[in-house]
Amino acid sequence: MDEAEGRPADLGNPPGSAAQPFLRPSPMLLQGQDYFFRSPATLLDFQERMFGADLVADEPGDPVPCVLVLARAADMEMNELSLALAEHDIRMVRIDADRCLDLALTIYTDTPLIEFQRWLLRPVLVWRRHFDITAIPVDPTTVHGAYVREQWSAVANWLACRGDWEQVNSVHSTEHLDRLTQLQGASAVGLRVPRTAVTTMPGRSRPGGGRCIVKTAGHHLLEPEPGALRGLFPRPLDIRLSGEAREPAPVLVQQYLDADHELRVFVIGDRAIGFRVQKLDPAQLWVDPDSVVVERVEVPEDLVQRLLALCRRWRLDVAGFDLLGVGDEWVFLEVNVNCDWRWFEHRADCADVSTAVHDWVRSRFAELSTAKTGWGSW
């Protein structure tokens, strides 16, 4: 011990030399990532605006069947769904993570009813999409913020798992559907997958023996503060720069494959709708979307059957699959259960996915709302 200071002597530096600070390099996936997006919390939902402005007459009587959506204000797919359902007199209500702090909400545990604002409703179909706890506008480093996040996390998970409500994309399955589990499942149904390593030392990993890319094991977007989203996009692995450096958290190192083209396939129920995507690098979809070429294409029947098998395996109703066409093979990359389709439709000048989703939700709602089920005591 250093008697003067009461601390261990610095054994790593010679006497009289200054201690050198340890500088940990920035994680590889945070280097050069310039994508930033501010997610607005502006209310755009058609039905919520109409009901909130008292432009729709209340109907006395039994609780109103509805579609319950857990999302965030910027979820334009759900804004569009709200309008489409209103055209068929189907009530949709939503709980947005970035607008939930002053919500008047009571959820009954012994009967499948909720009081939402001043309305008594009976959810028959629940869809949790972009209800991200990180979007709740509180400071999680404070006791108050941590408390609010914890309560909403518990209740949102329960809402999305209740057995007396039907779910879109069962959360019981999707909450554990990480990228590595996806690769195992895809391989099990006969799809080729890239060789992949999980490591904190990417410079020492070259699955496949050739060029590789580094990918996040988690989400492609970080939200370090509510509403502020930053991208984590795949990047080429340069072993000259990475060397023996250790990452502070595991990443995926994946075999690079020379693809003829990339395919995004949306599966809605038993339908598959495909788009061919042409881009120079993975991040281009976000950082330079106007330069990405998207065209509507038919999906080969053998691929459709494999994707439907995956949806049955993972209990998915609506999902977006990313694949590569390599020679005469399809290579599975990942599935996105919170898939956004309007951008692909806009680039390809079509509305096929929106139409299919709206039709599927209406059909499922009609089946469920007319089913004779017990509500418990009220």
Where is each model-derived feature located?
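Loop-centered beta-sheet repeat module
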Residues: 181-225
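Phosphate-binding site of ATP-dependent enzymes
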Residues: 85, 208-305, 310
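Short acidic-glycine loop/turn motifs at beta-strand connectors
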Residues: 89, 109-110, 267-271, 326-328
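A short beta-strand motif that forms the metal-chelation/ATP-contact edge
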Residues: 67, 212-215, 265-267, 329-343
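Short hydrophobic beta-strand segments
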Residues: 61-73
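C-terminal active-site "lid" helix and adjoining low-complexity regulatory extension at the edge
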Residues: 19-27, 32-40, 298, 312-316, ...
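Conserved N-proximal alpha/beta basic substrate-recognition cap immediately N-terminal to
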Residues: 22, 29-30, 35-40, 44, ...
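A short linear hydrophobic-aromatic micro-motif
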Residues: 194-195, 251-252, 318-321
